[in-house]
């Protein structure tokens, strides 16, 4: 297989004289270079990845006033009947733009995908949740607009309705979605403004594995866009929140016994400036919060939050507080104290993660953490979990610098100007459950 050099790697979004500019750090696979042991204690020789090549300011003049960048993953074919669709990059700026994931060329401006006229009062998007079956965007007025796709293998088939979702209901947040299987993945989460409650937006859409037809069959999409209330005992933890708020919430889906349920991890902040980590999963079309777990982060009280990176297979997050990096686990049934793993001289601007997951026969790969600092420098670290107990709790954590390195420094300095955001671009949704070195 010939892979585009931009299909996977680290994306750095910079503000260059007010304009959105992308840089790209490429992956290089090193074959048979390291020896380790797998989970059965057997010695294995395995491949590794390195970051030697960087293309700085590769894509210029995308637009003005950059705010962030995220990845829109395409349809991951399981059995090969429908072709796997890779990804797009969406640059959040004054005029949002969507880029081809393999070439980084512009595909469309987001606003051009509306039926007819733009919404009354204009369209200024601030957040989005995009999957291969539907796209949802929240604007600065708190309205969410929905784009339903008729087929699984086209990012731009269909269009946004110019009438806001659910009779002009206002939302104060819209959270990322991760959909890489037809089953058990039918939800986008949003925060309803009037009562500060987390709700579900249906995100249906499935294709027949026995056919090469990419069209979604009707009974899987008829409820897309419907607002559903959480149910069950643990729903109260996200309803009518008065003494706390959701600082951020990110996808945390993991393959548990093959069930592939959607999952999220939320960083909560109390009115007293305390923090708490909450994790939960959701069963398809059963709106109970499942496997709910919370962990108080006492060490982080009164600190200034910057960003959070999730390592979903390994079930921990790294949280940036000012110039500090904190490692926090979410192991069900176990209290885990945050661990300070690094302090920089400069403030952290943004984080992203590459949580490499392969089958156990290859041994465990360390997660990789991308860190951007306010001085324009960018680093990639391996997160080394040491002294792990049978319960899953880790006693010691270190980080090891992977980038910049001796090879990459031959191509220039490690300064990307005014960094706005960073992202590990996975390229293909199948990589979530089985990383391809």
Model-flagged regions — what are they?
Residues 108-324, 329:
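Acidic, serine/threonine- and glycine-rich low-complexity intrinsically disordered segments
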Residues 360, 365-437:
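Blade-level signature of beta-propeller repeat domains, shared across WD40, Kelch, NHL, RCC1
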Residues 26-30, 101-104, 150, 204, ...:
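Short loop/turn segments that connect beta-strands within beta-propeller blades
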Residues 14-75, 79-113:
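Beta-propeller domains
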Residues 301-379:
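Loop/turn-rich, solvent-exposed surfaces of beta-rich toroidal or solenoidal domains
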Residues 10, 88-89, 135, 317, ...:
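Hydrophobic beta-strand positions that form the internal "hydrophobic ladder"
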Residues 62-69, 233-246, 297-305, 345-358, ...:
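Repeat-based blade/solenoid architectures
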Residues 1-6:
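Beta-strand-enriched, solvent-exposed domains that form extended recognition/catalytic surfaces
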């Amino acid at each position: 297989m010939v892979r585009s050099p931009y299909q996977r790697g680290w994306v750095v979004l910079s503000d260059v004289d007010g304009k959105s500019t992308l840089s790209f750090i490429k992956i290089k696979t090193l074959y048979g270079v390291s020896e380790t042991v797998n989970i059965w204690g057997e010695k294995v020789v395995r491949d590794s990845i390195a970051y030697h090549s960087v293309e700085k300011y590769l894509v210029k003049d995308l637009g003005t006033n950059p705010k962030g960048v995220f990845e829109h993953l395409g349809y991951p074919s399981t059995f090969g009947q429908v072709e796997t669709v890779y990804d797009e990059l969406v640059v959040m700026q004054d005029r949002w733009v969507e880029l081809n994931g393999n070439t980084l060329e512009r595909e469309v401006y987001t606003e051009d995908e509306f039926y007819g006229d733009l919404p009354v009062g204009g369209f200024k998007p601030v957040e989005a949740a995009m999957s291969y079956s539907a796209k949802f965007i929240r604007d600065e007025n708190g309205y969410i607009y929905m784009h339903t796709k008729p087929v699984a293998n086209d990012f731009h088939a269909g269009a946004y309705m110019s009438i806001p979702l659910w009779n002009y209901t206002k939302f104060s947040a819209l959270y990322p979605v991760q959909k890489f299987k037809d089953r058990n993945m039918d939800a986008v989460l949003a925060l309803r403004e009037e009562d500060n409650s987390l709700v579900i937006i249906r995100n249906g859409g499935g294709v027949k594995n026995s056919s090469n037809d990419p069209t979604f069959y009707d009974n899987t999409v008829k409820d897309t866009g419907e607002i559903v209330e959480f149910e069950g005992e643990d729903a109260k933890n996200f309803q009518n929140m008065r003494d706390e708020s959701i600082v951020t919430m990110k996808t945390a889906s993991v393959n548990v016994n093959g069930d592939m349920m959607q999952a999220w991890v939320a960083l909560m902040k109390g009115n007293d400036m305390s923090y708490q980590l909450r994790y939960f999963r959701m069963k398809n079309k059963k709106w109970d919060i499942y496997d709910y777990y919370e962990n108080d982060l006492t060490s982080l009280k009164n600190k200034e939050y910057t960003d959070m990176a999730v390592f979903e297979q390994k079930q921990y997050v790294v949280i940036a507080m000012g110039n500090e990096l904190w490692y926090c686990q979410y192991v069900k049934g176990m209290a885990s104290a945050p661990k300070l793993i690094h302090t920089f001289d400069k403030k952290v601007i943004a984080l992203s993660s590459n949580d490499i997951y392969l089958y156990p026969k290859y041994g465990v790969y360390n997660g990789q953490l991308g860190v951007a600092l306010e001085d324009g420098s960018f680093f990639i670290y391996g997160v080394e979990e040491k002294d792990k107990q049978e319960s899953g709790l880790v006693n010691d954590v270190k980080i090891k610098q992977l980038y910049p390195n001796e090879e990459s420094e031959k191509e220039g300095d490690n300064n990307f100007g005014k960094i706005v955001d960073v992202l590990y671009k996975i390229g293909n949704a199948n990589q979530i459950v089985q990383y391809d070195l």
